A protein has these predicted regions:
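Outer-membrane beta-barrel "beta-signal"
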Residues: 71, 227-241
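Outer-membrane beta-barrel translocator domains and adjoining extracellular loop/strand segments
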Residues: 60-64, 104-111, 167-177, 218-225
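Transmembrane beta-barrel strands of outer-membrane/channel proteins
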Residues: 46, 50-56, 90-100, 156-162, ...
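Residue-level signature of outer-membrane beta-barrel architecture
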Residues: 54, 75-77, 144-146, 196-198, ...
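Cleavable N-terminal export/targeting peptides
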Residues: 1-40
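Short loop/turn motifs that connect adjacent beta-strands in outer-membrane beta-barrel proteins
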Residues: 25, 36-45, 78-90, 147-153, ...
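Gram-negative (and chloroplast) outer-membrane scaffold detector with strong preference
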Residues: 67-170
């Protein structure tokens, strides 16, 4: 799976860095004292920009990998509150990913345990697999922007989203069309993440994040094996207004 994931993510990341370089070169260098994360967040600004994301499943989904690309929009809502190292500001944000892919093992036979009439056993059953494409939206991102330094603005966040895929996901036992069974084309994505903005120009920053994402249909399908955990990394470019 990594053979498919790594080249795609490298190409997408290279494209993003090229765009950010063009954006920076289009402006004259600004004095260093104009680049201040704390000054920007003090204005309770809007923030928006593109990002790339990729990662892998863990545990029994370690042979799954993911890539996605999209845009984020957020608004810092409050001034700073709370004491000490947890001092920060509340931000509400959302993300839209028109490109979302998951690479899974190819269709195969898999030993599956079953229970019938009080008896248990196992059998080799056909499983679906391959590449799944879709669209994802994360309309609820609750972010706590921790107190920034001059150039770095860290955060922690909790979020919830939704994925639609072109086939039922994750791959599971193949069932005949029209028959009950299988998973769902709709899945939910509760998640937790950490990250930071690194300010490179006045009101512009590179953005880095790491997210632990759970994928589950909440039993919208007849089966809900889900992806209990995946670790996905994000890189983006952000403008602040």
């Amino acid at each position: 799976m990594l053979k498919k994931f790594v080249p795609s993510f490298i190409v997408l990341a290279s494209s993003l860095f090229s765009l950010s370089a063009i954006a920076q070169n289009a402006q004259e260098p600004a004095p260093d004292n104009d680049i201040s994360a704390s000054a920007v967040l003090a204005t309770r600004p809007w923030e928006f920009g593109p990002f790339l994301q990729g990662g892998v499943g863990v545990g029994d989904r370690s042979d799954f990998s993911f890539t996605s690309a999209g845009a984020r929009l957020g608004k810092v809502i409050t001034n700073q509150h709370l004491p000490g190292f947890i001092r920060g500001q509340f931000e509400y944000a959302g993300e839209l990913m028109p490109y979302w892919q998951s690479f899974t093992p190819a269709p195969h036979l898999q030993e599956t345990k079953y229970e019938f009439d009080g008896q248990t056993g196992s059998a080799l059953l056909p499983y679906n697999g391959g590449t799944f494409s879709g669209v994802s939206i994360t309309p609820i991102i609750l972010r706590w922007d921790l107190k920034p330094t001059k150039k770095i603005a860290p955060w922690v966040q909790g979020a919830g989203g939704l994925i639609w895929t072109n086939h039922k996901y994750p791959p599971d036992i193949i069932v005949e069309h029209g028959q009950p069974g299988g998973t769902s084309v709709w899945n939910f994505t509760p998640q937790f993440g950490v990250g930071f903005h690194y300010f490179v120009r006045p009101r512009q920053s590179l953005t880095f994040a790491a997210n632990a994402i759970h994928i589950s249909s909440a039993s919208l399908g007849d089966r809900n094996p889900g992806v209990n955990a995946s670790v996905q990394f994000q890189i983006g470019y952000t403008w602040w207004k």
